[in-house]
A protein has these predicted regions:
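Feature for soluble, non-membrane regions of globular proteins
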Residues: 10-207
């Protein structure tokens, strides 16, 4: 999404990227994730990545590229900010106020085939997220064989750079949970399961 803004010299230019709207209200994920967390995580952290990315692409050929094109063709600060914009947008869509419960449809079939049962998958995914060292993301991805697997990435890492398609993610950077859970990442992970938007997961598997 492009956004036109005024510079200090009153010259109009088009920002390459803007912060996508949340798919729900700031308080919609309570009591599992507070509105205060979203105000900081979405309103400040995610916005900062968007601002940084616009600063890096302004006046370059990258300003006309998609996030996916930048992510798969760059490194360093450009990659980090582009990937974090994409990762966070994907993360918000993976949750919803009417989420949680067991998967259905394509997600249930893929998870049962790969892990034997949803309980096995939930246990393995939770352990991977809890032990993902430092800052990063834990993903359920669709691999090149068409099956699903768990993938951990560090910092701004994104599955598309390894040829996998993201279908579900949890953000395990501390800013995702520190307001609500302090340093208790496992407690955040357990609460997060109540928010998983399985309809969105199905759409990613089938798309």
């Amino acid at each position: 999404m492009r956004k036109r803004v005024q510079t200090p010299k009153n010259k109009e230019f088009t920002m390459a990227f803007s912060l996508p709207p949340l798919p729900y209200e700031m308080n919609a994920l309570e009591p599992h994730i507070s509105s205060e967390t979203l105000e900081f995580h979405y309103g400040k952290h995610h916005q900062t990545y968007v601002n940084n990315l616009n600063g890096l692409v302004e006046g370059t050929d990258n300003a006309s590229k998609s996030l996916e094109e930048i992510i798969t063709s760059s490194d360093g600060g450009l990659f980090n900010n582009a990937a974090q914009v994409w990762n966070h947008t994907f993360y918000w869509n993976c949750m919803g106020p009417n989420g949680g419960g067991n998967p259905t449809g394509s997600a249930a079939d893929a998870i049962n085939q790969a892990f034997g049962s949803f309980d096995n998958f939930k246990d393995q995914f939770s352990k991977s997220a809890a032990t993902n060292f430092g800052s990063g993301w834990t993903w359920l991805v669709k691999n090149s064989s068409g099956g699903v697997e768990i993938q951990n990435t560090s910092n701004a890492g994104c599955p598309m750079t390894s040829g996998n398609k993201a279908v579900l993610t949890i953000d395990v950077w501390e800013h995702a949970y520190y307001v609500d859970k302090r340093n208790a990442r496992p407690a955040y992970i357990e609460s997060w399961w109540n928010l998983v938007n399985w309809d969105y997961v199905n759409s990613q598997l089938e798309g």
